[in-house]
A protein has these predicted regions:
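Immediate flanking context of iron-sulfur cluster ligation sites
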Residues: 453-464, 482-499
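A Rossmann-like FAD-binding core segment of flavoenzymes
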Residues: 38, 77-100, 107, 184-280, ...
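Glycine-rich Rossmann-fold phosphate-binding loop(s) that bind the pyrophosphate
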Residues: 16-19, 44, 148-149, 169-174
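FAD-site-proximal beta/loop scaffold in flavoenzymes
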Residues: 132, 137-163, 235-240, 246-328, ...
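FAD-binding core/adjacent interface of flavoenzyme oxidoreductases
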Residues: 1-10, 15, 70-165, 240-242, ...
């Protein structure tokens, strides 16, 4: 570029304003300030980006709407970013590179990033009929809601305040976490699920141990196939099961899973499978000017030799991988558009690349007080499976609410299930992510949760990951506390630890307490 020529900023449009989009916007702020990017963010909800994972905590009163916010609209606008809330996109006009809104306005782009997330599944039940694929809570009968956004949280909070029995439909991790959160705060809760036990597909026999723990937490657990809902005076009154059984309640929370939002991509003829198909650079397949990140994206690298992708990866529904994608796209945009090979980013650190040979598979962790469950990798094999190099060790202690399963190939941990043993689960996660071999005596790992193990266990080292969502190590949190952070909120503001699922909050508090206990002792 001729130095005398005026700088023409690249027009970047981000469709969606959830946690993943907010992360990308942070990366692009320096480019906006430098005049190299004209950024427009189109959010469908009336609220700025917030941590959707913690919506259930808002519903039960554990935290506030303000506390889970991830972006300040006024601050972003003052930076020069065009943030539009309540903006609904009608379609994408690819030939003319513009996004058409339902109000008739057109927003032009040079680069388009789709961060449309996922929508809750509306089960096909009598009494819940509505437009196919609709996730509009306004189209649900009174007393019925999802638990996906702040509007849903307000609906559930009102039901709890009225001391109504909450019926949660869905035995997956979202339904279980919602049921536990409500029960822990004194709510009367019934969990209705399909199959023998909640989370049976993921946990196998460990699901039966989990079901016992849920009952001990005060939740009524009902197995059955739902056929419809019943209304009284126009308001939800119960769920009808096969066989005529009715589960009564004053409010129904639908937690039947989510599906990627792909309608905009389909409408402009982008390649779509479960999600919007993207290559390993997160560009929409066959496109030079469109990217997709987060729950709506499905990685399908066309390069068979690409070790980073290793085939197709469906949307994971986890906030950590979405943030990593936002980091990757943000870094690429900075390198392309900064004009000097890159603009130094200040503030939060991105989750570090684990490097070759280190596992990046998602680990699913149940986040609840006093009920622990974790699952990762391949878990279908049983102890009697005969296959070269494969070994499966399994323990069950239903009387004490404990279950563990370890799957190894040539001694290396490739899959795990752990229920009711938090220390064992944490150690297995560490071994799984490192691709480590297990000790010859697998049962030695179970001792971590014994009375003797609790007394002799040493704390994790500084290099251990404390916050899985943001990829923050224990050492980074320790450094922030030593520098003056005295609360989880302080640590989150400096390191981003704790801003994802919230499952590491107790670990952050422990680091803070240990720091000040040592200071007093000295």
């Amino acid at each position: 570029m001729n130095p005398s020529e005026p700088l023409v900023p690249s027009r970047v449009v981000v469709v969606g304003f959830g946690p993943v989009a907010a992360r990308l916007v942070e990366h692009l702020e320096p480019l906006v300030a430098a005049g190299r990017v004209a950024l427009t963010v189109l959010g469908q909800e009336p609220d700025a980006a917030y941590n959707r994972v913690l919506v259930a905590d808002v519903a039960v009163g554990r935290t506030s709407e303000a506390a889970i916010g991830l972006a300040d609209t006024d601050t972003l606008r003052a930076t020069g970013i065009d943030v539009r809330l309540g903006a609904r996109v009608d379609r994408i006009d690819r030939p003319f590179r513009r996004v058409l809104l339902t109000d008739g306005e057109a927003v032009d782009y040079d680069r388009l990033v789709l961060a449309t997330g996922s929508r809750p599944v509306r089960p096909r039940l009598t009494g819940l009929e509505g437009p196919a694929g609709s996730d509009d809570a306004h189209l649900l009968p009174p007393g019925v809601s999802f638990l996906r956004d702040l509007s849903d949280a307000r609906t559930v909070a009102a039901a709890l305040a009225a001391q109504q029995r909450i019926v949660v439909l869905g035995g997956g991790i979202l339904g279980i976490e919602a049921a536990l959160a409500a029960a822990e705060e004194g709510g009367r809760v019934t969990l209705v699920h399909h199959g023998r036990s909640p989370m049976e597909r993921l946990l196998g026999d460990g699901a039966r141990v989990l079901a016992t723990a849920l009952r001990q937490a005060g939740i009524t657990v009902v197995a059955g196939t739902s056929t419809g809902i019943e209304l009284e005076h126009g308001h939800f009154a119960g769920v009808r099961l096969e066989g005529g059984v009715r589960v009564d309640g004053g409010a129904l929370v639908l937690a039947c899973g989510v599906r990627p939002r792909t309608e905009l991509a389909e409408g402009c003829d982008l390649a779509v499978a479960d999600g919007i198909l993207v290559d390993h650079t997160l560009r929409a397949v066959g496109m030079e000017d469109i990217w997709a990140i987060g729950d709506c994206a499905e990685v399908c690298c066309l390069r068979s030799s690409c070790r980073a992708c290793a085939g197709a990866t469906a949307p994971q529904g986890l906030i950590g991988p979405g943030w990593q994608q936002a980091d990757d796209v943000g870094a690429a945009f900075v390198a392309d558009l900064s004009g000097d090979g890159g603009v130094p980013l200040t503030g939060f650190r991105s989750a570090p690349d684990p490097g070759p040979g280190v596992r990046r598979d998602p680990v699913v962790v149940l986040k609840a007080r006093g009920v622990d469950a974790v699952v990762a990798g391949e878990t279908d094999a049983d102890p009697w499976t005969v296959e070269p190099g494969l070994a499966v060790a399994e323990w069950a202690d239903p009387g004490h609410g404990r279950y563990a399963k370890m799957v190894t190939r040539d001694g290396v941990l490739t899959g795990l299930v752990c229920v009711g043993m938090p220390r064992t689960g944490a150690e297995l996660i560490l071994l799984f992510e490192r691709g480590s071999e297990l000790p010859a005596d697998r049962s030695s790992l179970l001792r971590l949760d014994s009375a003797e193990g609790l007394l002799t266990a040493s704390p994790p080292g500084p290099a251990a990951t404390l916050c899985r969502c943001a990829g923050v190590t224990r050492g980074t949190v320790q450094d922030s506390v030593a520098a003056g952070c005295t609360s989880v909120q302080d640590v989150s503001a400096v390191t981003r630890a704790g801003t994802g699922c919230g499952g590491c909050h107790d670990g952050i508090r422990a680091v803070i307490e240990q720091h000040f206990a040592a200071a007093v002792a000295s």
